[in-house]
From Swiss-Prot:
Belongs to the mitochondrion-specific ribosomal protein mL59 family. Its main location: mitochondrion. One of its GO terms (cellular component) is mitochondrial large ribosomal subunit. This is Large ribosomal subunit protein mL59. It is found in: Mitochondrion. It comes from the Eukaryota. It comes from Neurospora crassa (strain ATCC 24698 / 74-OR23-1A / CBS 708.71 / DSM 1257 / FGSC 987).
């Protein structure tokens, strides 16, 4: 028993200070002391906001408060936790690998703007290029007939200049 506690302490001390501080402020239920109820055994930080990665609604004013950790800081913490193999100890966040994989499976490899009836914006010259080149190709294919007709009618009587 004492050996496992020593190992856990040694593992905790091997974590980087930022991750260690975070886990001390917001300990997950899995590392609480034996017999402690997660609902009653809370740190002052957890009482203020149970999940520091999610926005909270003020109980009196009803106003929403930003998360304690910004998305950038969340991503940094998740990366640190992944490097040290303690990612499952973090509270829920959109930056967790499981959440990213779930979203990727749910939405697929979609690109915004390529749905049914949607076009990828692009520049106007890029969007009209295909139609313009097709029109040019048709004009080039019709060119021998146009030249023959021009030679027959002559310069003076020619009225069908291509627009």
């Amino acid at each position: 028993m004492a050996a496992t506690v020593k190992q856990h302490v040694q593992l905790a001390l091997s974590l980087p200070p930022r991750l260690r501080t975070f886990l001390a402020r917001y300990p997950p239920a899995s590392i609480l002391p034996a017999g402690a109820d997660p609902e009653t055994h809370k740190t002052p930080y957890q009482e203020e906001s149970p999940n520091p990665f999610m926005p909270t609604k003020h109980p009196i004013t009803g106003k929403w408060h930003n998360p304690k950790y910004s998305l950038r800081r969340q991503a940094e913490l998740v990366k640190l936790a992944q490097e040290h193999g303690v990612e499952e100890l973090l509270p829920f966040t959109r930056k967790l690998n499981e959440e990213k994989l779930r979203k990727r499976v749910e939405l697929g490899l979609r690109v915004k703007g390529t749905g049914v009836g949607e076009k990828v914006k692009g520049h106007k010259h890029e969007r009209t290029l295909v139609a313009k080149m097709e029109k040019r190709r048709e004009a080039m294919l019709a060119m021998p007939d146009l030249i023959r007709e021009w030679k027959k009618v002559g310069k003076r009587n020619w009225t069908k200049f291509p627009k």
